Amino acid sequence: METECRIHTLVADVALFAEGQVLLVRYRDMAKNDNESGWFLPDDELAYLEHPERAGTRILKEQLGLTGLKPRLDHIESFKGNSGAWHMSFHNKLDLERMPRLKTSNALAEARWFERRKLPVRDEVAHHGWALHVLEMMTKGQT
């Protein structure tokens, strides 16, 4: 059975908040991320038939070495991507009391905590500041 779809792209990300800060990452292999070098929320494509919240848990484990955490779906975006494929992005959110110790995977070039009021400028964020837009939507409580 074919499990790769070229018509749709399903992506999950996680906005991880702790101590008034949010975690952003840069990926080592830009080719896997639309040749974007800027900051992202930790993200990945959904595995075949994977639930978006389970994808959030997997992303935290695989990319950041965090286990036992269960991010919750905050909102969904639907749009046509640069490739022409229909993109659905599932934005998960998790608030922690304390910053966890990260064990970053080799896929990440960098993981950095940013104060919520001192986020990087839009030009430094991948996809024209998309992570900033997602965080803004979460802050406004728009779902």
Task: Please name every model-derived segment.
Residues M1-L24, E45:
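Conserved N-terminal beta-strand and adjoining loop/helix that marks the start
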Residues T9-V11, F17, E36, L41, ...:
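Short connector loops at helix/strand junctions that flank enzyme active sites
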Residues R6-H8, N82-W86, S105-L108:
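A generic structural micro-feature
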Residues Q21-E62:
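Conserved Nudix-box catalytic region and its N-terminal flanking loop in Nudix hydrolases
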Residues K32, E36-S37, S105-T143:
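Nudix hydrolase/Nudix homology domain
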Residues A18-G20, E77-R101, V134-M137:
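Active-site-adjacent beta-strand/loop module that shapes the phosphate/pyrophosphate-binding cleft
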Residues L23, A31-K32, K80-N82, P120:
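Flexible, glycine-rich phosphate/dinucleotide-binding loops
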Residues T67-H75:
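A short coil-to-beta-strand element that immediately follows conserved catalytic motifs
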